[in-house]
């Protein structure tokens, strides 16, 4: 089905509607699973030696030093323009402001007299950030990951990226307080972060995007007892736009294309109650597509994308919630009034002047978001992902005495005798003291 095909939602059967909201299949195979498993085992067993072999095999690079030196990072900084450095500084300031505001106050309550319960937060001690290489270095992801890690108070923050690492990534790492950067990419980088090598330290949690091999490696290490936790499940990028007749077609088209250019497996969807708006957006997409350097990539993504006409805006919201997009853009009159009805989305952009690009780079929200339907259960990345919650309880003699019979009754009902005894022994001790 061509992207230019305008679909009337209410003329479709329930099965057709379901098909319209299906996402492109994620490329997985037994061969990827086996290959990644072998890489993990090899790196775990042979450490740095295995990392160098994989760099030669996959990156066609001879790596003499796995650790990037301070001199290399300083030289990278010198090669960047002041304009780019200033732009990064503005982005970091906004990310800092938004994520600092996410700090949770401690909870400290008396659930009943003499029974004190608290909730406190502690940072994840060590985190590893993975940043892909390629022709378009994702240095903005360094800002999005390293900044909240620093605010959370993570003691160890390290970064891996395939060699040669772009100057922008090295500078962003320095700007955000990353302590060590390593010349290693792919599934082998995930293995190094999960298990540790002579050069790369083992970390508690791994963050960052990657290809099918990186994604599979993260999945596997998160399921190994000696592995590491990961940020969230990964999938192709996506955006859904809700637009009414007052939206600007060129703005809508540019937002759709900014997501489509990410990759051929990206998906973009327009929902509008105005058929004429759908037609005008399709025309604007074609005009803008012709000017894009990544036009072929975007065109492939558009082949699995949709222009859907609905009954009204309420139905747009209903369909959007059913789909649960990574990015949701609402370009309608009084866009904010629709927010309360949104139940599943990674990040929401309201009005004509809130392009997805703002959140991707510099508004302050995080661009690491759940995708592929995971918005039903997962949240956008935030400060909490770099922290742990811990509860504390303290019972006075009086508080314990008042609660003891309740605990004994519940423990006996579950036939957990030792649990009951732990209370009964204390009750008897109090009686002896009386």
From Swiss-Prot:
Instruction: Give the highest taxon in the source lineage.
Output: Bacteria
One Pfam family recorded for the sequence: Histidinol_dh
Which cysteine pairs are covalently linked by disulfides here? none
Where Zn(2+) binds, per the record, is at: 259, 262, 360, 419
Q: Tell me the organism.
A: Shigella dysenteriae serotype 1 (strain Sd197)
What's the name of the protein?
A: Histidinol dehydrogenase
Q: Which pathway or pathways does this protein act in?
A: Amino-acid biosynthesis; L-histidine biosynthesis; L-histidine from 5-phospho-alpha-D-ribose 1-diphosphate: step 9/9
Class of the enzyme per the UniProt entry, highest EC level: oxidoreductase
* Gene Ontology terms describing biological process: L-histidine biosynthetic process
